[in-house]
Amino acid sequence: MPSRPTRVRYRVVGFMLALGAVTYLDRACIATLSPDIRRDLGLSKDQMSWIYSAFAIAYAAFEIPTAWWADRMGTRRVLTRIVAWWSAFTIATGAAWSFGSMLVIRFLFGAGEAGAWPGMARTFSRWIPRSERGTVQGIFFAAAHVTGGLTPMIALAVAGLCGWRWTFVIFGVPGIVWAIAWHRWFRDDPEQHAAVSPAELAKIVAGREQSSGQHEGWAYWRQLLRHRRPAH
């Protein structure tokens, strides 16, 4: 008798939707709270620009290394570590006491958050059937941008109740909770998850690119260069 198909992959999508929301909450709230931050820390507009740039530079510098790390170590371990890391520095943002401390904290925050989107992309590639990836990623991006649009209102509401410092603390907690839940429940491949039925597993792996395929990673580029012919 055929096994009943499970839908464990949709729980993975739920985790990714939650993580997308966390990334936007943690990265976007600082712009909304910048007037209060500038006033309390005595910062100029130029100094706030440097703080924003510190995040962007770290994000760009660490995105490829953390993506490589996720490819080698798997997203269970990597996302657990980087989400806990950047959530800790989201909380630490509320404890900043000067321009220098804020600059360092936001740089380290950006270094952690850099791996979020590559990690999520790899998770989708391992868990979502090719026939569903477009729809799932469309839902994911839409939800993430809705959160981005709501973040200023949420940040202002929370800051109005408890100030900008506690807002960063409150925004950092969901990421810590997410990292713990992710590490306990998730597995890098559906083959490793006890709750996935054979029917669901067959659907997920059908048509999935094999890691040994000629268009996988460096093997593709080596073959491309090997067979390259000069133009005449």
Model-derived features: positions:
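Extracytoplasmic
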Residues: 11-45
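Conserved MFS/SLC helix-loop-helix module at the cytosolic interface between two early adjacent transmembrane helices
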Residues: 61-100
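Juxtamembrane intracellular "pre-TM" segments in multi-pass secondary transporters
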Residues: 2-5, 189-232
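Helix-loop-helix hairpin linking two adjacent transmembrane segments in secondary transporters
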Residues: 143-193
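Short hydrophobic/alpha-helical segments at membrane-entry points of transmembrane helices
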Residues: 98-106, 232
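Residue-level signature of mid-helix packing/kink "hotspots" within the transmembrane helices
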Residues: 28, 56-64, 114, 148-149
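Helix-breaking motifs and short loop linkers at transmembrane-helix boundaries and internal kinks
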Residues: 42, 74, 95-101, 112, ...
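Cytoplasmic helix-loop-helix junction between adjacent transmembrane helices
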Residues: 105-145
